[in-house]
Amino acid sequence: MDLKEIVCAHSPDSDDAYMFYGLATRKVRSKLLNFRHQLEDIQSLNRRAMNGEYELTAISYHAYPYVADKYYVMASGSSVGDGYGPMLVAQHPMSVDDLKGKRIAIPGRLTTAFLTLSILQPDFVPVEVPFDRILDAVKDGTADV
């Protein structure tokens, strides 16, 4: 019997690596399915989910209302929490009021990071930067936060 291949799309970030570890290392096996992994940044995954491109994909909470007609939320797999994320980084300590009007690096407009920041402090200038380059953007001054 031929195995049906399912593409598992997720980011290369450590939280997604942890969530998909069992499938990626074939520690979770199926006699019916073969899982192939596609690694992309979260904003790209959000956009591709809007087109229903993958059978199984990681997305942002913010993106889900836009793809709810194509995907179900699984009972496990989340990367939001106190002291974990989303979080802001800056060269020096800042208050919420200090964020007003600042250029803030975000990993995309459909991300949970952008949504929660917009609720916390709606008056900022979003600077879209791939997730893995946010620290560099703050360090080199492309973004204030």
Where are the regions a protein language model picked out?
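Bilobed "Venus flytrap"/periplasmic-binding protein-like clamshell domains
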Residues: 3-25, 86-145
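N-terminal hydrophobic or amphipathic helices and topogenic motifs
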Residues: 1-79
